[in-house]
Every structure is written in C-alpha cells, then in structure tokens.
Amino acid sequence: YKEWNVGFFNAIPEDLVSDNIDLSNITWLRRDSKFHCYADPFILNVSDYTIDLLVEDILLGSKNVATICHLSVDKCTGEIIEKYTLIDDNIHNSYPLIIRGDTLDEVYIVPENSYSTELNVYKYNTLLHSCEHFSTMLPVAVAATILPYNGAFYLFATSRNAYNKDLYMWTSNNRLYGYDLSPILIKSNLFGSRMAGDFMHVNNTVYRPAQDCLQGYGKGIILYKVEDIS
C-alpha cells in the first residue's frame, strides 16, 4: 500500500511562491497507529504550541475506506494530541475543504467523495466535534475548491471520469450553494489540472496550487498565478 503523511516546516507565504523553501527540516506527523496514515491537510487553527488540521484518515488495507478527522498536533514534535472523527460513512472521504462563516466558530466542510453522486457540505460544530449535513452543492466533483472573486464565487474541481485531467469551473452568488449546473472546462491535461489545496493570497496576487499527475497521482505540485476570471 502507498502510505501518505503530513509534514510541517517554517515558511512565509512569499517563500512558497518564490521557490525559496527549505525542506531540510520537516517535522513529520507522528502517526498514532501503523494501520492509519493521513493526507490532504487543511489548516483549521494555529496557536503558539499546536496546529489543528482537518485531514483524510486512511485505514490501510480497508479497500479504500477513509474518514475525515480533526487532529490537534504539537507543533514541535508532530505528536497527535487529540483526534476527532468527523465524517465516517464507510466509504472514501478525502480533501476536507474548509469554508469559514461570518464568526470564528462557523465552519463548513466540503469533503471529496468520488464514490458518491453528490458534493455535500457539512456544518462542523467545533465545540462538540460533530458534523451534520448542511446542503448539496453539486453532483459529484473531485477536489472542489472555491475562490471568491469580484463578488462571485468560483468553484474549481475535476470530474469523476477524468479526475486527474479535466478541470471545470462553476459559478454562484453564494459560497455554499446555488452553483450553475453547466460548468466551463478550464483545462484538460494531467499536468496542473487537479487541485492540490486552497487558493493562496500573497501580496494581492492569487495562486492556484495544482497537481502534476503526468507520472501518477500526487507526484508533484505546481503553482499557477491567477490573472483574471471571466
């Protein structure tokens, strides 16, 4: 089985877009079980001593079953301090995109589930560490990621039939629902189509992280500068 893990390193946003990254001193997540590995991290919160993440929790040897978990991790050691299972429906869930509401405790999760027929939104109760279904955003879409831009919301995702290759864009006037059902094909290539994380804002410029899948899923990450959306 392929084994994935999460690593932490110190950098500022400008380092990430200038290729000035020092990967010589990575703190790796200390897995709590040899049967579990973690992938697709999205940062929920950072304090002086801990990092809170939403991640894909993969149960090795389980015929592609994965859950969405909240991990609280020691920043210095990579040790998991707390773990909460949020979405577990006995199929493969991954890529837990975080959407923040108007208050600090208003959090929504949009996980990828390419085995489902829908892209669903869950409201996360951060006090009780529980999720409830909030809405259905679209028919199934892979690695859905949303960019607010000039008063509208643009959702980028690949299709289930070409999940590493065909990147589409949907639009809406609301971040959580109302996306049009006739997406625009943006890119069709194994290089740089599938999303690799949330959009980055650095010095008033927006960047789109994407995967290099020419040699297989997750073989590399590319950054694209977003110049305009129309």
Language-model segments: which ranges?
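Carbohydrate-active catalytic/glycan-binding domains of CAZyme proteins
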Residues: 1-230
